[in-house]
């Protein structure tokens, strides 16, 4: 339920608008609402962190608006709550009016949803399922530089799940489309909410099966097999891609030791 802040409320403050997050001094604000001049704003609790409520305020601040990416190296739980806040703020901003009848909607009090009192339609936040996979060949791992990535970072392959497709089918299809290779021994590892803008990353590991590596230039700048001790620039810690790479490097090292 939303409430108007009196200034006495305390907790973590997620102030978001248009996929941006208020990060005064580069950090997520914490403490009394009055200390951050938030009295009078409309807020809604979206979770708890370290025993304190986490509040969402949907508004633009005059300065200090940044990206939730700046919180990647903080605790994973707090990063996920910040991502939830940014996604919810954008969801409510983009669902002010019903797509069926055009009437104004309001936020549900019991769940993350927008409701239309006119036609009774109910809308939920969009979540885009994505697969991401680390592929091993002996003591090597397949890494690629994506066209949308900056700074020369090399990472594992990933892509969106298509309609009517299983996760396993999506992994095999994405790998074949982007690298021209076939995989085997596919196994699920973990998942990570990824608020850029509203993805859910489902992570896998796999082994190389067959095919000659040939990258898709529309998706990748380059791709190659890298020995575990000769890796290029990698994604930052805290990302599911980095975890997949580190887990695969362990397997590559074990394979190398057994081969000696």
Swiss-Prot record:
Coiled coil: none annotated. It is an enzyme of class 3 (hydrolase). PROSITE patterns: NUDIX, NUDIX_BOX. It catalyses: a 5'-end NAD(+)-phospho-ribonucleoside in mRNA + H2O = a 5'-end phospho-adenosine-phospho-ribonucleoside in mRNA + beta-nicotinamide D-ribonucleotide + 2 H(+); NAD(+) + H2O = beta-nicotinamide D-ribonucleotide + AMP + 2 H(+); NADH + H2O = reduced beta-nicotinamide D-ribonucleotide + AMP + 2 H(+). Divalent metal cations. Mg(2+) or Mn(2+). A divalent metal cation 2 binds at residue 174. A divalent metal cation 3 binds at residues 174, 178, 219. Keywords: Hydrolase, Magnesium, Manganese, Metal-binding, NAD, Zinc. Substrate binds at residues 25, 69, 111, 124, 192-199, 241. Its cofactor is Mg(2+); Mn(2+); Zn(2+). One of its GO terms (biological process) is NADH metabolic process. Residues 125-248 form the Nudix hydrolase domain. SUPFAM superfamilies: Nudix (SSF55811). Its EC number is 3.6.1.-, 3.6.1.22. GO terms for molecular function: magnesium ion binding; manganese ion binding; NAD+ diphosphatase activity; NADH pyrophosphatase activity; RNA NAD-cap (NMN-forming) hydrolase activity; zinc ion binding. GO terms for cellular component: cytosol. A motif (Nudix box) lies at residues 159-180. A divalent metal cation 1 binds at residues 158, 178, 219. Belongs to the Nudix hydrolase family. NudC subfamily. mRNA decapping enzyme that specifically removes the nicotinamide adenine dinucleotide (NAD) cap from a subset of mRNAs by hydrolyzing the diphosphate linkage to produce nicotinamide mononucleotide (NMN) and 5' monophosphate mRNA. The NAD-cap is present at the 5'-end of some mRNAs and stabilizes RNA against 5'-processing. Has preference for mRNAs with a 5'-end purine. Catalyzes the hydrolysis of a broad range of dinucleotide pyrophosphates. NCBIfam families: PRK00241.1. Homodimer. This is NAD-capped RNA hydrolase NudC. The gene is nudC.
